[in-house]
Structures are given as C-alpha cells and as structure tokens.
Amino acid sequence: AAHLATPMMHEVERCRLALSRAQSGEAVALVCSGDAGVYGMASPVLELAEDYPDVDVEVIAGATAAQSGSAVLGAPLAHDFAVVSLSDLLTPWEVIERRLAAVASADFCICLYNPRSRKRADRLSRAAKIMLEWKAPDTLCGWVRNIGREGQQSGMCRLSELGEFDADMFTTVFVGNADTKRVAAVWSRRAGIGRFHAKGNDHGAGPGNPDLPLARGR
C-alpha cells in the first residue's frame, strides 16, 4: 500500500489527495493524531467531499489529547470542562480571549491545545493572565507532553506559575476549577481513582487499583 504525506499547513491538499484516490476506486485511510473530529481532518475532508460525490466518507473515532492526557494525570475532567485551542492560525486571538474569559468565569475545568509555538511564544502566558482574572492563583494545573509517545512527560503546577511553563506544540495543558484537588499523586475533580508511578519526570495513570485513594464526590 502507498503511504502519502503532506507537510504542516497543507491539510487541504492532503484531503483532496485522499478524496481523489478514493474517487479513482482505491480504499483510502486518511490518518491524523488524536480524534479526527477534534481539531482534526474530519471537518475539512467532509467539506471537500461534496466535490467527490462517488466517495463515501466514514469517520472513525479516536482518543483526543484531552482524554488521553487526562488519563495520565488522573481524572481532571471528571465533570464539566471546556477545550480551547490557543492557535490563532484559523481563529482570531480576540475570539480566543473571549472564549477563555467565558469558560474561566464559569469555573470550567479547561484543557488547552496548542499552548505555544515558535511564532506564538507568549500565548500561554497571555491565556494564564486571562484565567487569573476569574480563577484563584493556587488553582491546580497539569500538563502532558508527547502523550502516548516515546519521551512522554507530565507534571503539575499552580495557575500562578502556568504562564512561565515552557510548553510546546506537543504539550496539552489542563487547568482545574475550584473543586479540583490532588489525591495522593494524581489529581481529581471530585471523583476518580488512579494508579501512579514515577521515574524521573515520567508519570502515568491507569484504572483499577483498589489500594490507592478514592476522591469521593460530595
């Protein structure tokens, strides 16, 4: 089978290539990381599919970084939460600021995608300042880098420290709410159970260990 790839910023080209090959009768899988329907390729390929009426598109669910990163940290998204991308390539920064303020003022747990890049080095610090207008400085935050990949790392900090964290585009950031707390070595929003191990900066979590503490909902 042929493996075809395009560089960053050529997603539409990749979608058209996949649809064109499918139109010619080939069985094609368009692969992206995480869940194709969350900041992924499902949306553009479905829009472009109107130009390829003979192609049937099937979207296969995956695990987005909010889910897989949450499992590493424990259970930070056990209740209502919001996901916000800090990338302004497709969304104006002013819109991102309004959305951050809205979810922070409502005390959602917040998952941040694309927290920083070479061209957007200040986005995470600016986002932290916005959230600090509504959330307490000691709000528990966490981060996971290279989720599920070699070199996976994770850690925790307070919201007052988040703006100084050296994130990158492979990092997913989690910001808790007023109820978020640390349970043993993992953290939870009211309820969750987890297994934790640490070696250096590597952290992991998983279900089903009855010997570890349980954070019970009120």
Where are these regions (language model features)?
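A short acidic, often aromatic-flanked loop/helix-cap motif at beta-alpha or helix-coil junctions
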Residues: 9-14, 65, 89-91, 148-151
